[in-house]
Amino acid sequence: MKNNRTLGLAILSLLLFIGNAPLAAKVKNYTLSSPDGGLKVEISTGDGLSYRIMHENDTILSHSNIGLVLADGTLVGKSSRVTRERRKKIEDKVESPFYRFKEFVAACNELDLKLQGGFGVTFRAYDDGVAYRFYTTVASEVTVKDEVAEFNFLQDYTAYLPYTTNDKKPMAMAYQNVYDVTPLSKAQPKLAFLPVTVDCGSVKLTLLESDLEAYPGMFVQSQ
């Protein structure tokens, strides 16, 4: 029997408790594929904003809600009406003086969805991964109170979780620990820091952050 499992996300000092939610009745889907066609991400908009990831037509990440909660109560992603859609191909040469190659090419396909209200979300599909980022065109200062980020799996896969070592102040630690290898259904209800890996059978899915300036700020928690 398949067990639906959810990983909730905590950003910086914010802990979110997120559950599965049904898709909106009025949904518009946008599909983005990697350059080699092996990875595909399907973004759904309507009453909410969600995405799912497929590898060789197998769903490895089920529909997972994303969004922002602003300090003024605005819910970015809820009732998400797309006002503009832009697509482009990207090939960036990245210098890597400390890698075994002096440079490498990061190639992807990008989908930019501008949402009503001065916000938007950009998705990128690489041959070996998918990324997304929220942005705003609002001229004034914006304070983000919470971020919604779900990672929903269709089966009770094996996860590799590095839990926090500080139970009293779980976000105050050295980000060093051994990995606990466990089915998602047996995961402890405590914060785990990144990277986290889930063995989906045919592929392994690893959760990571980008554009970090200091210590990691993302934590996940099994729900």
Go through each PLM region and give its residues.
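Bacterial N-terminal signal peptides
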Residues: A10-G19
